[in-house]
Curated annotation (Swiss-Prot):
Residues that hold Mg(2+) according to the record: 9, 58
Co-factor requirement: Mg(2+)
NCBIfam families (UniProt xref): pantethn_trn, PRK00070.3-1
Stated role: Transfers the 4'-phosphopantetheine moiety from coenzyme A to a Ser of acyl-carrier-protein.
Top-rank lineage group of the source organism: Bacteria
Compartmental location: Cytoplasm
SUPFAM superfamilies given in the database record: 4'-phosphopantetheinyl transferase (SSF56214)
The species this protein was found in: Mycobacterium leprae (strain TN)
Biological process according to GO: fatty acid biosynthetic process
Protein name: Holo-[acyl-carrier-protein] synthase
Matches recorded under HAMAP family: AcpS (MF_00101)
């Protein structure tokens, strides 16, 4: 069938770092234990690491929303936590879905690319039905 959705997101790393450091923030709860663990291993660049993963989560939502053009938006509660970025042994990212979004995207292959350079983290997501 082909490409059914494309999403892109840019994150200001300094702004992201400020949000994450706010007292009482629940911002970190949107990251899975695995994502937080992976970031803690990269202590000098943990914020960059998480900012790029936030960009992936947002890009997945945008791609999914775009694939539902002219249909009512569906944003399940805690959707960000249901989108997890995992890496293979060589560090290549992949998206793992759980919860309601996984049920909606069962037949979809998710392609992801993420980067961070300077003060910006970015991600591109392509949803493809084979």
């Amino acid at each position: 069938m082909g490409i059914v959705g494309v999403g892109i997101d840019l994150v200001s790393i300094p702004d992201f770092a400020e949000q994450v450091s706010q007292p009482g923030t629940v911002f970190m709860t949107i990251f899975t234990p695995g994502e937080r663990r992976d970031a803690s291993v990269k202590s000098s660049s943990a914020v960059c690491h998480l900012a790029a993963r936030w960009a992936v989560k947002e890009a997945v939502i945008k791609a999914w929303s775009g694939s539902r053009f002219a249909q009512r938006p569906m944003l399940p509660e805690n959707i960000h936590r249901d989108i997890e970025v995992v890496n293979d042994m060589w560090g290549r990212p992949r998206v793992r879905l759980t919860g309601a979004i996984a049920k909606h995207l069962t037949d979809v292959t998710i392609h992801v690319s993420l980067t961070h350079e300077g003060d910006i983290a970015a991600a591109v997501v392509i949803l493809e039905v084979l």
